């Protein structure tokens, strides 16, 4: 993987201290999507990871909301289905719902029954790996539908939160950041 491409993406990230609450150092990935070159690099690097780290993916599951920014494009380029995992009351029909803890709150995820067939090989994608709570909730949804979880793919990992240690499936991240908890953080 080219250091120039990785550095280009890293230079697009913007940090916001004390957002969404005091003690959190928020990593804003949105500038990547405002730059067509950066977005193209992101998709190319994610596709390279899919092709080298994970085999024969049938479904890419994207987590609300920022997993939706690149999940469908990645699924299209990888020639597989895209399935959204959303907050409750955002999807119609029969759903499977699980609750989970995030680095600064509690939430729930839902997936439509029948969107993943038993035995399909599933890769979960999201923007940031923090505590691993959202990924674990998505793991449970995939498993309940009978999918075979092959791994997780993230744009950025906040290493000080050690979310990777909670995940059982192979995990790949393009970028790493925040090796230590921010000063004044509840995680310090």
Curated annotation (Swiss-Prot):
One of its GO terms (biological process) is adenine salvage. It catalyses: AMP + diphosphate = 5-phospho-alpha-D-ribose 1-diphosphate + adenine. Pfam families: Pribosyltran. Its cofactor is Mg(2+). It is found in: Cytoplasm; Nucleus. It is an enzyme of class 2 (transferase). Keywords: Cytoplasm, Glycosyltransferase, Magnesium, Metal-binding, Nucleus, Purine salvage, Transferase. Its EC number is 2.4.2.7. Catalyzes a salvage reaction resulting in the formation of AMP, that is energically less costly than de novo synthesis. Belongs to the purine/pyrimidine phosphoribosyltransferase family. HAMAP family: Aden_phosphoribosyltr (MF_00004). Homodimer. This is Adenine phosphoribosyltransferase. It comes from Schizosaccharomyces pombe (strain 972 / ATCC 24843) (Fission yeast). The gene is apt1.
């Amino acid at each position: 993987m080219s250091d120039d491409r990785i550095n280009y993406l890293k230079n697009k990230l913007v940090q916001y201290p004390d957002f969404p609450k005091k003690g959190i150092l928020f990593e804003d990935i949105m500038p990547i999507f405002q730059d067509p070159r950066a977005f193209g690099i992101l998709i190319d690097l994610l596709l390279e990871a899919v092709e080298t780290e994970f085999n024969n993916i049938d479904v890419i599951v994207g987590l609300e909301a920022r997993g939706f920014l690149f999940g469908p494009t990645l699924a299209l380029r990888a020639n597989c289905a895209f399935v959204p995992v959303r907050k409750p009351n955002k999807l119609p029909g029969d759903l499977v719902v699980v609750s989970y803890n995030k680095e600064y709150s509690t939430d729930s995820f839902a997936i439509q029954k029948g969107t993943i067939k038993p035995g399909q090989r599933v890769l979960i994608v999201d923007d940031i790996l923090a505590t691993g709570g959202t990924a674990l909730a998505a793991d449970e949804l995939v498993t309940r539908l009978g999918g075979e979880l092959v791994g997780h793919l993230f744009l950025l990992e906040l290493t000080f939160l050690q979310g990777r240690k909670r995940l059982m499936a192979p995990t790949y991240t393009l970028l790493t950041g925040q090796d230590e908890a921010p000063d004044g953080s509840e995680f310090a």
